[in-house]
């Protein structure tokens, strides 16, 4: 977190993309972005990743170890890609909670899953990752896919996730990260800051939201930093896997 003070009584600031804003304003600004993109979020994911996001999520599911009867929390679950898969894995004796802080994203996810016939073992909860409204030691697995970078106090969110996991439970963080070679890094910069806003303008008439998303990726902790943050929060056996030359990384940690 970028915590800056102009005086002893000044409110701490944090980054919103490349801008510094008062901490109290970040959640509202992020909410505005996702209210704007919610209706076409799935379409834009497919266009901007060339469908690769489905492969990244599939790998996260394979590494989750989720099985019949488990209880899973899908934070920042958005339109429900992971929740739908987990619903099949846990079966009628398990439960999946799709949690999202953004009401528009939550509605899109609920409507989409209901249209697909996914309902019996899925619950939808509007929740803040920093203050999860669930009991201690409650879930076998917690996931957050492409959501942690939008959280103001990431350390608080990681500790909240640790609290709600059962001992031995797994946290999986799927997030954009730092490319592992210079050529990919340069290509990714050009793609992110030129193509992403352009596609946002053409498809959703909103280039600024996609410019923020590109900037938020650059401001997110890199692979090793996030690993250290998870260890500091209390997770054990923290590892990460780079995908697509580090464009995306999947971190996994275990609650002791």
UniProtKB/Swiss-Prot annotation:
Pathway given in the UniProt record: Quinol/quinone metabolism; menaquinone biosynthesis; menaquinol from 1,4-dihydroxy-2-naphthoate: step 2/2; Cofactor biosynthesis; ubiquinone biosynthesis
Transmembrane segments: none
Gene3D superfamilies documented for this protein: Vaccinia Virus protein VP39
The UniProt record lists the keyword Transferase: yes
Entry-linked InterPro entries: SAM-dependent_MTases_sf, UbiE/COQ5_MeTrFase, UbiE/COQ5_MeTrFase_CS
Enzyme Commission number(s) from the entry: 2.1.1.163, 2.1.1.201
Biological process according to GO: aerobic respiration; menaquinone biosynthetic process; methylation
Keywords: Menaquinone biosynthesis, Methyltransferase, S-adenosyl-L-methionine, Transferase, Ubiquinone biosynthesis
Residues the entry annotates as binding S-adenosyl-L-methionine: 79, 100, 128-129
EC top class, as a word: transferase
Cleaved signal peptide residues: none
GO molecular function, one term: demethylmenaquinone methyltransferase activity
Function description: Methyltransferase required for the conversion of demethylmenaquinol (DMKH2) to menaquinol (MKH2) and the conversion of 2-polyprenyl-6-methoxy-1,4-benzoquinol (DDMQH2) to 2-polyprenyl-3-methyl-6-methoxy-1,4-benzoquinol (DMQH2).
The name this protein goes by in its record: Ubiquinone/menaquinone biosynthesis C-methyltransferase UbiE
Organism: Pseudomonas savastanoi pv. phaseolicola (strain 1448A / Race 6)
The encoding gene: ubiE
